C-alpha cells in the first residue's frame, strides 16, 4: 500500500464517519502508522529530511504528493507543516488562534465541491442589504415627510395670503363705509342747518304777516259804518263764518228764506269774536239812525278787542 492511497483512504473514512460531530482533524497517529512508514523507500543518496539516519530518496514520492489533489485543504496544510523526527512524523506547531475555526470551514467538502475559490459569506451581505434597504426606506420616508411638510407649509402660506387679502378687503370696505357715513352725516347736518334757518325765516315771516293782517282788519272795522258796499259784503261773510262755528247744527241759509229775511232775523248782539256787541246796520232803518249807530260803534273802544285766539285764527284765514 502506498502512502498516498493510505492517506486518502484514512481521510475518506474520517469524513464519512457518522459519529464525528465536527470536521476531520489531522493527527499524526491516524495519518501515519509504523507499517506505513516501513513501506516507504528512502534512498540514502538524497538527504531531503535533514537527518543522517534516514536516507531520503523521496523525490519521486514528493512529486507524486505535489501532483496529488486533496479534497480537504486542512489536511494538505497539515501535511505541509509536519516534520519527521526520529522516523516519526510530528504534528504542526500548536497554535491557539487556529483552534477557533470559522463557520465557513466546518464543512469544507460541500463548499469546495462546487467552487474552488474561498467562500463568500452571504449573511453579512444580507445584513448590509437590509441596512441599505432600511437606509433607503428611511431616506424615502424622510423625503416624503419633507415633501409633505413643504406642501403643508406652502398650503399654510397660501391660506395666510388669502386671509391677509380678505382682511385687507374688509379693511378697505370698512374704511369706505365709514367715509360714506361721515359724508352722509355731514350732508344731513348741513341740510338740517339749512332747513332750520329756513324755518326760522318762515316763522318770522308768519309773525309779520299775522301782524299785518291784524292791522288791516282793524282798519277795516274802523271803516265798517262808512256805508261802503265792499266792506259790508266782507263783514257779512265774516258773520256767516262765525255763526256757523257758534251753531254747527243750524243751516246757514234756508232755501225758503231770502238773504234779506236772514239779515233781518239776525240778532244785533252777536259776539263775532268781539267782547262787546256790534250794531249791524238795518235795512229798514233811516239814514240818520245808521249814522248814529256807526258813530256809536266807532266811539266804543271795546268793539276793537277780540275774545279768543281761535276767532283770531279764523279771521286770519278769511
UniProtKB/Swiss-Prot annotation:
GO terms in the biological process aspect are: positive regulation of aflatoxin biosynthetic process
Task performed by this protein: Transcription factor that acts as a key player in the regulatory circuit that integrates secondary metabolism and cellular response to oxidative stress. Regulates the genes involved in development, stress response, and secondary metabolism through direct binding to their promoters. Particularly involved in the resistance to oxidative stress in asexual conidiospores. Binds aflatoxin gene promoters carrying the cAMP-response element (CRE1) under aflatoxin-inducing conditions.
Give the UniProt family note. Belongs to the bZIP family. ATF subfamily.
**What GO cellular component term, any one, is given?**
nucleus
Q: What subcellular compartments does it reside in? A: Nucleus
| Phenotype of null mutants | Leads to a decrease in aflatoxin enzyme levels, down-regulation of aflatoxin accumulation, and impaired conidiospore development.
Q: What is its main location?
A: nucleus
Q: What is the species listed in this Swiss-Prot or TrEMBL entry?
A: Aspergillus parasiticus (strain ATCC 56775 / NRRL 5862 / SRRC 143 / SU-1)
**Mind listing the UniProt keywords for this protein, alphabetically?**
DNA-binding, Nucleus, Stress response, Transcription, Transcription regulation
- Record-linked Gene3D superfamilies: 1.20.5.170
- Report what the protein is called: Basic leucine zipper (bZIP) transcription factor atfB
Query: Quick one: where's region Basic motif?
Result: 160-199
Ranges where the record places region Leucine-zipper = 202-216
Q: Which gene encodes it?
A: atfB
Amino acid at each position: 500500500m502506498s502512502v498516498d492511497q493510505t492517506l486518502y483512504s484514512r481521510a475518506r473514512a474520517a469524513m464519512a464517519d457518522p459519529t464525528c460531530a465536527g470536521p476531520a482533524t489531522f493527527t499524526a497517529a491516524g495519518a501515519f502508522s509504523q507499517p506505513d512508514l516501513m513501506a516507504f523507500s528512502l534512498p540514502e543518496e538524497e538527504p531531503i529530511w535533514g537527518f543522517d539516519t534516514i536516507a531520503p530518496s523521496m523525490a519521486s514520492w514528493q512529486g507524486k504528493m505535489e501532483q496529488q489533489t486533496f479534497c480537504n485543504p486542512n489536511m494538505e496544510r497539515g501535511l505541509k507543516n509536519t516534520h519527521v523526527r526520529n522516523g516519526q512524523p510530528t504534528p504542526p506547531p500548536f497554535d491557539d488562534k487556529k483552534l477557533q475555526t470559522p463557520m465557513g470551514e466546518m464543512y469544507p467538502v460541500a463548499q469546495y465541491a462546487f467552487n474552488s475559490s474561498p467562500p463568500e459569506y452571504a449573511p453579512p451581505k444580507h445584513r448590509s442589504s437590509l441596512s441599505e434597504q432600511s437606509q433607503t426606506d428611511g431616506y424615502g420616508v424622510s423625503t416624503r415627510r419633507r415633501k409633505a411638510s413643504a406642501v403643508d407649509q406652502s398650503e399654510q402660506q397660501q391660506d395666510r395670503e388669502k386671509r391677509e387679502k380678505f382682511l385687507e378687503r374688509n379693511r378697505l370696505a370698512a374704511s369706505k363705509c365709514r367715509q360714506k357715513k361721515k359724508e352722509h352725516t355731514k350732508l344731513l347736518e348741513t341740510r338740517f342747518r339749512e332747513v332750520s334757518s329756513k324755518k326760522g325765516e318762515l316763522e318770522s315771516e308768519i309773525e309779520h304777516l299775522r301782524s299785518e293782517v291784524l292791522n288791516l282788519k282793524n282798519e277795516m272795522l274802523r271803516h265798517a259804518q262808512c256805508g261802503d258796499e265792499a266792506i259790508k259784503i266782507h263783514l257779512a261773510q265774516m258773520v256767516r263764518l262765525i255763526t256757523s262755528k257758534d251753531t254747527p247744527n243750524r243751516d246757514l241759509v234756508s232755501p225758503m228764506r231770502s238773504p234779506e229775511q236772514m239779515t233781518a232775523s239776525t240778532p244785533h248782539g252777536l259776539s263775532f269774536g268781539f267782547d262787546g256787541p256790534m250794531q249791524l246796520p238795518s235795512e229798514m232803518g233811516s239814514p240818520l239812525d245808521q249814522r248814529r249807530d256807526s258813530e256809536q260803534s266807532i266811539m266804543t273802544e271795546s268793539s276793537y278787542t277780540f275774545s279768543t285766539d281761535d276767532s283770531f285764527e279764523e279771521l286770519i284765514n278769511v
